């Protein structure tokens, strides 16, 4: 019975209703690189661009988040995700960048060849509940 269901789904036959107005559970961005990143410095520079985009999306959505998730995909397509939850919600790229950088440094393999980096914020709350002006957490 389950096998038939998955066969139909694989054939794009799915009659379930689509809800285009679902509540967003996370806001993030990721980048695939044409050449593998091999140094922490190049990865840190890429993270700056990524967290800037996440900040812009969070500002547009008027959200703040408690949990940051870093995604690392290596050249051999192995992938890891690591998360950290903070006590106060954040929205600023500087705070997200510092936290993402710390996760990267802690979990990066020796002699890495990174193909993709991503950052997402989850445990979202409306920004107006905590105020639009976020104080630095660091």
Residue spans of the language-model regions?
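DNA-contacting surface of Y-family translesion DNA polymerases
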Residues: 1-114, 124-134, 138
């Amino acid at each position: 019975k389950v096998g038939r269901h998955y066969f139909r789904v694989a054939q794009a036959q799915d009659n379930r209703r689509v809800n285009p107005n679902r509540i967003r559970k996370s806001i993030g961005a990721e980048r695939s690189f044409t050449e593998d990143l091999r140094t922490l410095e190049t990865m840190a520079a890429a993270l700056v661009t990524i967290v800037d985009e996440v900040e812009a999306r969070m500002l547009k959505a008027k959200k703040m988040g408690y949990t940051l998730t870093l995604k690392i995909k290596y050249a051999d397509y192995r992938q890891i995700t690591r998360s950290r939850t903070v006590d106060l919600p954040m929205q600023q790229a500087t705070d997200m960048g510092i936290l993402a950088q710390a996760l990267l440094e802690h979990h990066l393999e020796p002699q890495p060849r990174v193909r993709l980096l991503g950052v997402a914020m989850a445990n979202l709350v409306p920004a107006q509940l905590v105020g639009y002006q976020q104080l630095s957490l660091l």
